[in-house]
């Protein structure tokens, strides 16, 4: 008899007098973990659950004890698959490639170091979007961006029409060396954030309205006229804003060469920012990863 708060319930407990009952999760006399439980462990790992949470969940639901080593052994099976994916051949030409880096803490030689995960998402000539790769490397630098771009080239990419970034450290130098014909479009939203960073609250609405006349202009000539007007109005109060736009103009204005449909696609890095949010959501429970491989396998599972 079960006695919940709403009243007693009579439960009939079946008896297996002949010993014919066969459990579905753990078979009789089974000492190893079933494929089903391994898949559950991979699924939980992909959702960002910690090893201890996975152990508790498996014990509570399935009555099976698993250790840290077991969880690592099971999730390590993903590594060859992830590395094969990372080396797969790519299309020869991509219309747009979005590139970004997100940062994590990883143990290395007894110390906790900050590492960057370099990410590339491509849109091919048929409009299909695909994650081209994720690379765990040193903190953002031109040298490592060159490594990433050369990896893409070695996997078959011959040309990228437009590379969209948020003004990444060292990126312009690296892409000019590997794909010299590629045009760069820096993210307008990031430029707006930088422009508004030190603006007083009472001025922000008016300033953002003036900035919109620049990035929403019908063409580059009109945008430059709007930039001149903004400079005249705000240069004394906020002397760094207009020069910042002028300094980065060649990489901020690329989208004016294209029709509106293409402009909407490339003037921000929303396509990769959404993917980054997905990764951060899964990895937020991990403050430090024990190895580069442990980080890579979680990111790969999160992507799948």
Predicted regions located by residue number:
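Structured, non-catalytic alpha/beta "coupling" segments that mediate domain-domain communication
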Residues: 1-13
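RNase H-like nuclease fold core
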Residues: 12-17, 24-30, 64-65, 73-165, ...
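Short, amphipathic alpha-helical "recognition" segments used to contact nucleic acids or chromatin
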Residues: 36-48
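DNA-recognition alpha helix
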Residues: 52-63, 301
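Short, basic interhelical loop/turn and adjoining N-cap
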Residues: 59-70, 237
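Conserved beta-strand -> loop -> alpha-helix junction used to position metal-binding or nucleic-acid-contacting
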Residues: 162-169, 174-212
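Acidic/histidine-rich catalytic cores and adjacent linkers
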Residues: 213-304
């Amino acid at each position: 008899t079960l006695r919940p708060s709403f009243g007693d319930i009579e439960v009939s407990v079946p008896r297996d007098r002949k010993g014919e009952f066969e459990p579905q999760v753990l078979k009789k006399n089974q000492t190893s973990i079933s494929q089903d439980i391994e898949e559950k462990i991979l699924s939980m790992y992909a959702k960002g659950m910690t090893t201890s949470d996975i152990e508790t969940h498996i014990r509570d639901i399935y009555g099976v004890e698993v250790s840290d080593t077991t969880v690592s052994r099971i999730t390590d099976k993903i590594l060859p698959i992830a590395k094969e994916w990372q080396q797969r051949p790519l299309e020869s030409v991509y219309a747009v490639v979005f590139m970004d880096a997100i940062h994590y803490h990883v143990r290395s030689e007894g110390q906790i170091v900050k590492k960057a995960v370099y990410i590339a998402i491509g849109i091919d000539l048929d409009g299909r979007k695909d994650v081209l790769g994720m690379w765990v490397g040193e903190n953002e630098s031109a040298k490592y961006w060159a490594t990433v771009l050369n990896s893409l080239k070695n996997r078959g990419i011959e040309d990228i029409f437009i590379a969209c970034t948020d003004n990444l450290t060292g990126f312009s130098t690296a892409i000019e060396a590997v794909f010299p014909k590629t045009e760069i479009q820096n993210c307008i939203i990031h430029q707006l954030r930088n422009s508004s960073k030190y603006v007083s609250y009472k001025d922000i609405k008016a300033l953002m309205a003036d900035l919109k006349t620049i990035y929403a202009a019908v063409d580059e000539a009109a945008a430059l006229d709007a930039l001149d007007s903004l400079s005249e109005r705000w240069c004394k109060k906020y002397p760094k804003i207009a020069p910042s736009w002028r300094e980065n103009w060649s990489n901020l204005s690329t989208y004016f060469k294209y029709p509106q449909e293409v402009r909407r696609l490339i003037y921000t890095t929303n396509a990769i920012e959404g993917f980054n949010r997905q990764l951060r959501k899964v990895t937020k429970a991990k403050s430090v990863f024990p190895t580069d491989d442990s980080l890579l396998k979680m990111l790969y599972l999160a992507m799948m």
